[in-house]
Regions:
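Double-stranded beta-helix
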Residues: 191-217
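A short, N-terminal "cap"/entry segment at the start of jelly-roll beta-barrel domains
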Residues: 74-123
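Short acidic-glycine-tyrosine-enriched beta hairpin
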Residues: 159-179
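Ligand-binding loop in jelly-roll beta-barrel domains
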Residues: 176-200
Length: 217
C-alpha cells in the first residue's frame, strides 16, 4: 500500500474518465503500482456502472438507490490484476501503461545534472516527462505556479514534504518550493506532470527562468 496515495478526487475523476491525458497517465501508473488504489478505482467504476443500471431501469437515484448499490458492492471482493511484464530492455521498471508513450525514446541529459525523457501528448497542454536522478543527486530548488503531479516508478526521493517510494503519488501546489533529492541505492525514476513551467528560485533562476517559460530547457 502506498504511503502517499493519490487524492480521492483524482481517483474519482480518473475512474470517470474526465481527467486530461497527462494527469490520467500519472494516476494510471499509480494505480498499476498500488493495489489499494487499483481496488479503489475498480470499486468506483463498479459504483458508476451500478448507478447507470439503476438509472436505465427508471429508478430514482436517491439515497436509497445509492445504499442499495453500495450494499451489493460490499459483497464483491476486487482482486488486484497482475500486469504483464515490460518487454523493453532497460525499462523493466516501466508499467505497461507507460511503454506505449515511450516508443524508441531514450534518456537525455538535462540542465541540473539529471536525465529526462519528454513525453508529448496530443491535445493536452500539460508537460509530461520522465526524470532520472542518480542516488544523492537532486533537482534545482524550484517552485510551481500550478499543480504538479509526480509518481515514483523506481527508487525514491525526499523533499520537505516527506519521503516517496515506488508507487507513491505527490501533488505539488503552486506555492510549494522544494528540492527533491534522490535516496541512496538505485537511481530514482519518476513521471512528472506539470500544468505550467517551474520557476527556479536559486541563484541561476533569473537567467534560466525565461528559457523554462519558452520550453527551451
Amino acid at each position: 500500500m502506498s504511503r502517499h496515495p493519490a487524492p480521492d478526487e483524482l481517483l474519482l475523476d480518473y475512474a470517470a474518465g474526465v481527467l486530461p491525458e497527462g494527469p490520467a497517465l500519472a494516476v494510471s501508473l499509480h494505480v498499476a503500482l498500488d493495489p489499494a488504489a487499483r481496488r479503489a478505482v475498480d470499486r468506483l467504476r463498479a459504483v458508476g456502472g451500478a448507478l447507470l443500471e439503476e438509472e436505465e431501469a427508471g429508478l430514482e437515484l436517491g439515497d436509497a438507490a445509492l445504499e442499495s448499490v453500495m450494499a451489493r458492492l460490499d459483497g464483491v471482493a476486487v482482486e488486484p490484476k497482475a500486469a504483464p511484464p515490460a518487454r523493453r530492455p532497460g525499462f523493466e521498471w516501466a508499467p505497461p501503461a507507460l511503454l506505449r508513450y515511450l516508443g524508441g525514446k531514450d534518456w537525455k541529459r538535462a540542465f541540473g545534472g539529471f536525465e529526462q525523457i519528454e513525453i508529448g501528448l496530443h491535445g493536452d497542454t500539460h508537460r509530461v516527462a520522465l526524470l532520472r536522478l542518480q542516488p544523492g543527486k537532486g533537482l534545482p530548488v524550484h517552485r510551481h505556479v500550478a499543480n504538479e503531479f509526480t509518481v515514483v516508478l523506481q527508487g525514491g526521493y525526499t523533499d520537505n514534504t516527506g519521503n516517496y517510494g515506488v508507487g507513491d503519488f505527490a501533488v505539488g501546489p503552486g506555492a510549494q518550493q522544494h528540492e527533491p533529492i534522490a535516496d541512496p541505492g538505485e537511481p530514482c525514476i519518476a513521471l512528472i506532470v506539470v500544468e505550467k513551467p517551474i520557476v527556479l528560485t536559486g541563484a541561476w533562476g533569473r537567467w534560466l527562468n525565461p528559457l523554462l517559460r519558452w520550453g527551451w530547457m
